[in-house]
Design a protein with these regions (language model features):
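Intrinsically disordered, low-complexity acidic Ser/Thr-rich regulatory segments
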Residues: 1-81, 125-127, 132-215, 280-284
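Forkhead-associated
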Residues: 60-137, 197-269
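A short local loop/turn or secondary-structure capping micro-motif enriched for an aromatic residue
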Residues: 87, 108-110, 151, 157-159, ...
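Long compositionally biased, domain-poor regions of proteins
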Residues: 151, 168, 189, 222, ...
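Extended helix-rich, non-globular scaffold segments
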Residues: 272-273
């Protein structure tokens, strides 16, 4: 069965603490406030396209030196989405390219990671993230309706060892190592289920895999994979996340400013946006 292309809510709506006024982010300078020298650093023209629930293109917004996205403040106003913070994210032009920044939003900004195998859109020639994205712990990532947090377990959590009573070993299911855990976050702001990464490859999907979300129609049959790999020198472990050519993609929360590339998909609240550049303009 084909995976429907749609979006869904994921975290608790942004709110303002009662009685405490929210301090707005400073409004960035407009296009007339920035001067380019001989056009050397001028970025190509382009647009930010809002993708509808049916997968079709909605309103689009021309790129500028600084473009803010929010529920109340900014150039791109997503007024009907309560999962979007008042001023949520910013796209800024710098040294001939565009960069995406989270403005301390409640629910974060997520960027679609590349496919592990192939590329569905041949026009996307470059990517800001590697096909296998390194995970360092505490990352949030999205697939389908699922909001998942990845955490590396501490040494004390990896295994308790063999238990005994009065010198006799206790009978039980053989223990397996725990390298990391994946927590499922709900709209109530609490953790529902916790899954453990126990082997070299942990596949997440709707019908097959090690972690299965069978009731989520927006998750592909085999959607994403987390790999446990040796570090350089083999003395430790590292973890990667990759998308398995899913229909709706896997989105990783950005932790710092990220350079955008033509064709990138951005998740903000319930909204999906596509970053398009005019590849025929100077600087593209």
């Amino acid at each position: 069965m084909a995976t429907p292309a749609a979006r869904s809510p994921f975290l608790e709506p942004s709110s303002t603490t009662a009685g405490v006024p929210r301090t707005p982010f400073p409004v960035p300078p407009g296009p007339s406030d920035i001067t380019y020298v001989d056009g050397a650093d001028r970025p190509p023209s382009g647009r930010l396209v809002l993708i509808g629930r049916d997968g079709g293109e909605g309103p689009n917004f021309g790129l500028r030196e600084s473009l803010d996205i929010g529920r109340i403040e900014g150039v791109v106003i997503l007024a009907d989405d309560r999962y979007v913070s008042p001023r949520h994210a910013r796209i800024v032009a710098r040294r001939g390219s565009y960069h995406l920044r989270d403005l301390d939003s409640t629910n974060g900004v997520f960027l679609r990671i590349p496919f592990l195998r192939g590329n569905a859109d041949p026009s996307i020639s470059r990517k800001p993230l590697d096909p296998e994205q390194e995970l360092g712990g505490q990352e949030l990532f999205l697939l389908g309706q699922q909001v998942l947090r990845f955490e590396i377990v501490k040494n004390a959590e990896e295994g308790l060892g063999v238990a005994s009573e009065n010198g006799t070993l206790l009978f039980g299911t053989p223990a397996t190592p725990r390298f990391a855990r994946i927590s499922q976050r709900t709209v109530e702001g609490v953790i529902r289920d916790v899954f453990h990464v126990r082997k070299a490859e942990t596949v997440i999907g709707r019908e097959s895999g090690d972690i299965v979300f069978s009731d989520d129609p927006f998750v592909s049959r085999r959607h994403a994979v987390i790999r446990v790999l040796p570090t350089q020198g083999g003395s430790g472990r590292r973890f990667t996340l990759a998308d398995l050519s899913s229909s709706n993609g896997t989105f990783l929360q950005i932790r710092e400013e990220v350079q955008l590339r033509h064709g990138d998909h951005i998740r903000i609240g319930q909204q999906l946006l596509r970053f398009d550049l005019d590849t025929t303009s100077p600087g593209a």
